[in-house]
Amino acid sequence: MKKTEFLEIDGASGGYYALIALLGALIAIGLGAAYYMEHSGHHVTGMTNQIVWGTPHVFAVFLIVAASGALNVASIGSVFGKTPYKPLSRLSAVLAIALLAGGLAILVLDLGRPDRLIVAMTYYNFKSIFAWNIFLYTGFLVIVAVYLWMMMERRMNRYSRPVGLVAFIWRLILTTGTGSIFGFLVARQAYDAALMAPMFIAMSFSFGLAAFLLVLMASYRGTARPLGDELLIRLKNLLGVFVATVLYFVMVYHLTNLYGTEHHGVQGFILLDGGIYTQLFWIVQILLGSLLPLFLLYHPRLGRSRASIATSAALVILGGLAQIYVLIIGGQAYPLVMFPGKEVSSSFFDGVVASYSPSLPEVLLGLGGVAMALIIVALGIKILRLLPLSLGDASPSTDSGAESSGEPSAAGA
């Protein structure tokens, strides 16, 4: 069969320069917000001694989880041998690197003392999942970069499958580690669950594929390159499966917690009387982020509409952000149960639901991390041969390991 031709985009249009300028401005604003919080102190944020992980952590965890899932498209093509996905492998790998870089940038800038990161990188407490995650995150970046090299270098193509298998296993471990950050926190009743690790893996598949779909559709629309309905339908059906899987894990998580009397308090808080957290859970996470996308993706007519597919992917991302917000911030807002069966009160807000309102600098820092991920992808498709010249239904291209011919780029972007 004819090999796939990969070409850089021209990147000479006004729209492309406007996109780069917008993303660059968001990054600059995010850096400014980080500087403001660093020099003014975290009292200018909505975070307190009760809620120490705020909105930046929501963005960071979302990007890190989505990074693992974004690589899933490459894994399906090279590791599991599904030919239609192979031309997408390069973009999948770059998006995974970009999302993880954006998430880690938010984390580092939100630490308060990012210069102290050197301590965490030189002195390890291997009883802490945070110490393990340093290796998992940096290892992921290195392995995926090598994986991308194997795919793009013709003489190294034969190694792409074994390296892809290593990347596949590594990303499962990485997402397990991210979920275990919360699963191992036994003091927080909203976190303490072994189900966190597999649920985060399912979340990564859903969030990552949703992000990949939006990037893919935007890239081919902006460059006027053919993108066939057949491939989009494959991807949207896969997204529907992942969304349903996440919904299943969420249901099992809450049902198992409701079975144990000790968790009735925190479950009642999240599901019934948690105010904004309850609203985010039912309206944004469940209705808008799960049920509505499933309806749009599997509707006989709407499911074939590109607008519906893009809307569904955007809703999945919105629901994912709400899910992580409820998990991270709602889990901290519910008071610690220090003495089970007893009522606790003190001047240190023991036994009181903590209040939290996202501040503008926190949101801007999070958006800066998202912009950083997107600008890496935008520059990547201009500098490297990541995008196939055609993904049309009639295209016989199926081999992602092929070198492009080096002809001038197609018009667009």
Regions found by a protein language model. Name each.
Residues 1-29, 42-47, 123-124, 334-413:
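Extramembrane terminal tails and long inter-domain/linker segments of multi-pass membrane proteins
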Residues 5-11, 22-28, 82-84, 122, ...:
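Long, contiguous internal "core" modules enriched in hydrophobic/ aromatic residues
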Residues 284-287, 292-364:
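C-terminal hydrophobic structural anchor segments
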Residues 35-45, 77-85, 89, 111-114, ...:
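Juxtamembrane/interface segments at transmembrane-helix termini
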Residues 34-57, 109-130, 179-200, 227, ...:
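Membrane-interface interhelical loops and short amphipathic "cap" helices
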Residues 60-65, 132-145, 277-290, 350-375:
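Hydrophobic alpha-helical transmembrane segments
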Residues 51-118, 130-132, 136:
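Membrane helical hairpin/interfacial module
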Residues 12-65, 96-99, 103-107, 144-147, ...:
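Terminal, non-catalytic protein-protein interaction segments that mediate quaternary/complex assembly
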